[in-house]
Amino acid sequence: MTKVTYTDAAKKHAVREFLFSYFKFNAIVGLAGPNINEYIQWCKSKGYEDIEVWENTPDVLMNQLLTLQHPIKMKFGNILDAEDAKPNTVYDLDYCSTVYTLEDHITKFKNNFIMTFSLRAGIQFTIKEFFKTRKEKIIKSIVKNSPINHTIFTTNQGKYIFTPYCDTSAMCCIAKIK
């Protein structure tokens, strides 16, 4: 089932609010999801002035362009073609696929990102494959239950936050925060 909106996804919204609190930039590059105007309004409410949205499905892009109510940078193509190291930019990569189908995406983006994955492959497999693909070793992990359930992973190359959640299906976000 393809979602047409995330307005009723309370857990997704809580995770998004929590993770984006770690990024204080004015630019965002992302995948807008099913409702581009909802996404842009949310970005603007968080202070993002420079918004670049990528879409690689022609029908979805056409629908987004027909309903678009805000001036933004709209790119047709694979987000792998996006510049991956823009200064003062967060990358919002809401893939909704399993980790093992996104190896190129996981290795491309180095810093300041939030990646959303399906947990169909399981939590442990997702975590293990993510860091294996990035060629990083987990040095320390700290589990916290507040303000939402999350794990802070410190690796040999940085710091990440992992947040599992479930609205209609089991999902997770992994954010590179340092």
List where the protein language model places each region:
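Class I S-adenosyl-L-methionine
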Residues: 128-178
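Conserved beta-strand signature within the Rossmann-like core of class I S-adenosyl-L-methionine
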Residues: 111-125
